[in-house]
Amino acid sequence: MSRRDLMHILDVLWRLSHGQADVGVPVTRIDDAIGRGHGDMRTPLNLQSLSDESLAMRLPEGTWALTPQGIAWLKEDRELSDR
């Protein structure tokens, strides 16, 4: 998955969690938000690289959530983009 796609997924996690860390979002909701529907033949989402960078984490129930580091990273990215 491209870096651009991963950043898009971080934005989706932000929106669906209302900008809160540790709020689980089901992968199906992430898929829907990025335009991947039921039966999509593309490669399944691999969010591990976001976890490897401590920006998101997989919760025990199988959902994904932003970490506090992910929240801080997104806020900084948005501040820099506004300049």
Task: Label each residue range with its predicted role.
Residues M1-A21:
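Short alpha-helical segments that sit at the start of domains
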Residues Q69-R83:
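Short, amphipathic alpha-helical interaction segments positioned at domain boundaries
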Residues S51-E61:
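A short, conserved structural fragment
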Residues Q20-I34:
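Short acidic, hydrophobic short linear motifs in intrinsically disordered regions
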Residues R36-D52:
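Short amphipathic alpha-helical interaction segments
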